Swiss-Prot record:
Tagged with keyword Ribosomal protein: no
One function term, GO molecular function aspect: toxin activity
InterPro entries in UniProt: Snake_3FTx, Snake_toxin-like_sf, Snake_toxin_con_site, Toxin_cobra-type
Signal sequence residues: 1-21
Annotated organism of origin: Bungarus fasciatus
Lineage: Eukaryota, Metazoa, Chordata, Craniata, Vertebrata
Claim: Disulfide bond is one of the keywords in the record: yes
Name this polypeptide is given: Neurotoxin 3FTx-8a
């Protein structure tokens, strides 16, 4: 009986862990509310700030498997919790 209970606990923990999917914000607006469910390999939320000459500083948000390297005149922030790229 103890073995069965232990097996059920282990299976439950594994299934819960495999079922988790990160959610990130994906809109360019300053006060973003649009949520996107990331793919399994995407474990980070990203926010990139860049200078768009006519419009000023803009932000691009989304999901990523790895934190991208910043380009010239760009700032990149990565985080790993739901909707952390505000």
């Amino acid at each position: 009986m103890k073995t069965l209970l232990l097996t059920l606990v282990v299976v439950t923990i594994v299934c819960l862990d495999l079922g988790y999917t990160l959610t990130c914000l994906i809109c360019p607006e300053r006060y973003c509310q649009k949520v996107h469910t990331c793919r399994g390999e995407e474990k980070l939320c990203v926010k990139r700030f860049y200078d768009e000459k006519a419009l000023g500083w803009r932000a691009k948000r989304g999901c990523a498997a790895t934190c991208p390297e910043a380009k010239p005149k760009e700032t990149v922030e990565c985080c790993s919790t739901d909707k952390c790229n505000k």
